[in-house]
């Protein structure tokens, strides 16, 4: 056979592998497109923060803030462009070896923040220590709940308060893992997540929902007749009825197009949910097949799991769902991650501004929609 006819054969094998690699990457790794999404998060203003991971943001009863729960165990308060971020509170007295970029368990890891309007107290879900509270002046938070029905609260995540009933509801995402291993909780299929009802008057902590897979965000609806909680791995939003003829029962309220984190109620009664990222095929397979999820848990470092699920391109996504039907009302994204990454929370203020937190990135963002 002439040499010029053999040359294509020499190139065939690497060419085929190259094509397969591109196809595999496009098929398995690239995040899925979100139909109807508005690529407007690129227009948000970035407010840098000196510590990574403002996972939850909150405003006090006076409207001041936001307050941000960050990776080194502190809650910081934004005092405007002139004063910047200042210390407000912290969840652990152990401050000596705390890192501004990585979780140190002894320092605590504050997550969901909720102010009680009538007292000014700030309730804090700490991913290592439990449910905590600090007064309006800040400082060291006190532990409120670290056990419910004989099981340790390992991963307090987000909560909400019914001020009329003096009851606080919060998620315990796992009784096996703490915050650092959140993605392993989501992909392993481990079902030990709970919703806990804490009665402030009797000091009783009671489990009202269980058998959940990494239940992450939680919020009460506008009339406090039900609460919703979302599972990060399955993308399901569960509803638990607190009042009315269905009280004590649960159902599926919605399914969102990504991996959900915190939930915030709007003044109109709808919900914003921060999405860590859009889905891709590799993420779907890991979550769907429990054996694969457990294999990933045992063999892969957490940072690699995060990279694969994000499609090696961190980006920003948030979804607004109806407070009545659960249907998707709005999808906002930063498709290329040019401005916003790893969105953990979307918080809508009455002035029309949307504030965003991030579980990993050292920034919060604000989008003026008026």
Curated annotation (Swiss-Prot):
Cellular compartments annotated: Vacuole
Cleavable signal peptide: 1-26
Keyword annotations of the record: Glycoprotein, Signal, Vacuole
Glycosylated residues in this chain: 97, 171
GO cellular component terms, A-Z: cytosol; endoplasmic reticulum; plant-type vacuole
Classification lineage: Eukaryota, Viridiplantae, Streptophyta, Embryophyta, Tracheophyta
Main location group: other
Disulphide bridges: none
The protein, known as: Protein STRICTOSIDINE SYNTHASE-LIKE 9
Family membership noted in the UniProt record: Belongs to the strictosidine synthase family.
